[in-house]
Structures are given as structure tokens and as C-alpha cells.
Amino acid sequence: MPWIQLKLNTTGANAEDLSDALMEAGAVSITFQDTHDTPVFEPLPGETRLWGDTDVIGLFDAETDMKEVVAILENHPLLGAGFAHKIEQLEDKDWEREWMDNFHPMRFGERLWICPSWRDVPDENAVNVMLDPGLAFGTGTHPTTSLCLQWLDSLDLTGKTVIDFGCGSGILAIAALKLGAAKAIGIDIDPQAIQASRDNAERNGVSDRLELYLPKDQPEEMKADVVVANILAGPLRELAPLISVLPVSGGLLGLSGILASQAESVCEAYADSFALDPVVEKEEWCRITGRKN
């Protein structure tokens, strides 16, 4: 069925309030878009992280009286009479199919593919992880996830134990298991991420080798041959004393979720415990790796 969209431009601080206003005016869904394509951090679990200049887009049924919607919105204290907006009639198309068509199998490194369930596997002999977009972060589309997957693909994980610190969808832990790791441990502060990781592990036939914990439940003195943490630069710096003790002596560390401009400060937080490799960058993001002293 056809739809009508109404777009407002605002600050990140006001975006949530205007989202609520659009829903109260009859919008069936809301989308936030960056007005200037400015790179931002990935959201923490449960958080909506917005840009300084944000477009808030409400989607309305084609039968909606948009003059009435505008009249309702004019009463909002952040808008007022004659507020700037854009109304557009969208063509009739299968939007669910349109969304699904945007996701394709993706290759990382030499062996690893991430494939949505509705697509054919490009190479039956490759290491294939079946993963659909969902509630928790991590489908391989973000540069930080890509950097971590490429790093894991480059390692010999046969028989190793891997910790995925901030596991999100479980994509890194599951990829490690499919690449030969004997055991993976996923840790996340978000119960939804734990459930998403569990579901994705079952789909990929590795649930018997994946342990999942909220931080308060994780075992004491937990160790691994490889530790990967794709979170944010701030938490990586703050949690450096905790993360640094997770790899065994000679074990490997991979960190991402870091803008290239933040790499130096993150490296400083880990330099005493690890022999660090050169920083690898991709699309203004970077990956830091090293070996435990």
C-alpha cells in the first residue's frame, strides 16, 4: 500500500520528543536519519544515539489527512505555527521486501561469509554464519564489525577459547566457533543481546560451545586464548584493567568500536599489558590488536 512521510529537522536532543509527537499525531513508524552523514558511535545496548542535526521521519497511512496532522504538530512547543517540514507521497511497493533486499551475503577475509537466512549461501565450502538483522547490534555491515571479522578470519582458532566482550548479536563469538574455536564466551550488559546471541548460536549449530553471561554472572578468573571487544572507545579505556587480564599469557586481543581519532588514547590504556600491532583503519574507524605480554 502507498504511504505518506513527513520529515522534520531538529537537534539530537529534541529528536525523541518530536518522535513521540509524530506517533501521537498518527504515524505508524518513525525513522531517524543523519542530516549530514556524520560518523557516530554505535549505540550502547538499549540506547538510541542521535546526531547533532537529525531528520525525524514519520510514516503515515495514505488515507491520513496530513493537514490535520500538521495542525496537531503546530501545537507542540518545539514546533509552533508554520514549522518547517516536508511531506512526500511514497510509491507503492513491498517495503518488507525492499528492506530484505538491502541485505546480501558478505565476505570477510579468505574463508568467512555472513549470510541472511533468506539468501542462498554463495559458497557451500566456505565458513558460513547465518545471521539476520535483529534487536542486538552486529550483522557485519558496520566497519567495526567487519574489522573484527576479518581479524578472526586471519587467525588459527583451532581448539582455542575466545571471549566476545560486548557480544551483541553474538556474531563474533559464533564466527570464531565456525572458524574452529573449541569454545566461545559471550558477555553483554543487555539481556536482549544475550537472548539474540543464544538464538543465533542455535541457528548456526554452535550453541553447545557458546557460554553467555551478563557481567554480574561471569565466572571469576575467566581466561581465553583470544579476546575481542567491539564496543566503544570510552568503555574500552575505562574497562582496560578488566579486559587486559582476560587473555592468557601470549594470548591475542582485538579491539574495535573506535574512531581513528581515538586510537592513540585506547592504545595507551593497553600498552603496558600488550605488544600492540599497527592500527588498522576502515572508513574512519579502526581496529587495535596485540599479544599479551
From Swiss-Prot:
Q: Where, in this chain's numbering, is S-adenosyl-L-methionine bound? A: 145, 166, 188, 230
What cystine pairs are annotated? Answer: none
Top-level division of the source organism's lineage: Bacteria
- GO CC term (a single one): cytosol
Which reactions fall under this protein's catalytic activity?
Answer: L-lysyl-[protein] + 3 S-adenosyl-L-methionine = N(6),N(6),N(6)-trimethyl-L-lysyl-[protein] + 3 S-adenosyl-L-homocysteine + 3 H(+)
Quote the subcellular location field of this record.
Cytoplasm
List, in alphabetical order, the GO biological process terms annotated in this UniProt record. Answer: methylation
Which molecular function term from Gene Ontology is one that the record holds? protein-lysine N-methyltransferase activity
Q: What is its EC number?
A: 2.1.1.-
**Mind listing the UniProt keywords for this protein, alphabetically?**
Cytoplasm, Methyltransferase, S-adenosyl-L-methionine, Transferase
Family assignment from sequence similarity: Belongs to the methyltransferase superfamily. PrmA family.
What this protein is reported to do is described as: Methylates ribosomal protein L11.
Q: What is this protein called?
A: Ribosomal protein L11 methyltransferase
Which organism is this protein's natural source? Escherichia fergusonii (strain ATCC 35469 / DSM 13698 / CCUG 18766 / IAM 14443 / JCM 21226 / LMG 7866 / NBRC 102419 / NCTC 12128 / CDC 0568-73)
